Amino acid sequence: MIGLLDFDGYICKAFYASIARGEDDFEEMVKVLDDLTKAALDKLKDNFSHGAVIKVISGHTYKKDVYPSYKLGRKRNEDLGAFREYVKLIYEDLKVVPNLEADDVITMMAEDLGNCIVFSDDKDLRYYNPQYCKININEEIGYEADYKKKQLIQLLVGDKEDDIAGIPKVGEKTAEKLLDMYGWNVDSVIEIYRDKQVTIDECLKNLLLISPIRKENVIDYRYGLDDSTTLNNILGHFRYWNEKVTEIYNK
């Protein structure tokens, strides 16, 4: 069994766990990082008799180039940033795609693998790969049974941590009620945006930023993490949502 590690999350966890213990030395932080990584591998072996992990880390995301407000409100920790750069220097087996966040890369890899475990504290990732495990050593592998419904709910609600507004005054419970009325599908999500009088540009922005690159929402999708394939999929992602949103708003 393959484990896809959201290594951005692992780096954060190791950094803050070390700081909480009064340790600010990068080498000590790396020891924590290695312990967390080993724990993930051990869980795979304990549950599936064999296992391997792939450490995925974010590159510079195209989303910030298109929408500068994306994650603008997040506070930057310069020490954490320096530790992240240190990790990139000493780990030779990191999977980095220059224009994609780890979310996009993990989602694409998970679809290609078909059966894998995503290790992350980011709840969004388990909406797109339901077999998941949080990062802490004592966490167990779980399954998000309603992951497809959670995808649609999030498209309406947005993601405040990433500065994605969603529909004003629509929380998870309201989103569920609206989807019960309209139908549990992407077309209904866009119809709800339209009927709530959210502008077409804002609707498109929200859906583009929330939804990761995946087969279902990329025109002419091709699996691959090289530069040309990545660009193809980014453009296909934009075309898919632009055509779908425009069609429904113009009805």
Predicted segments — roles?
Residues 1-86:
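Domain-level signal for Mg2+-assisted phosphodiester chemistry and nucleotide/NA-binding surfaces
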Residues 47-48, 71-249:
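Extended two-metal-dependent nuclease catalytic cores across DNA- and RNA-processing enzymes
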Residues 1, 250-251:
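Short intrinsically disordered terminal tails
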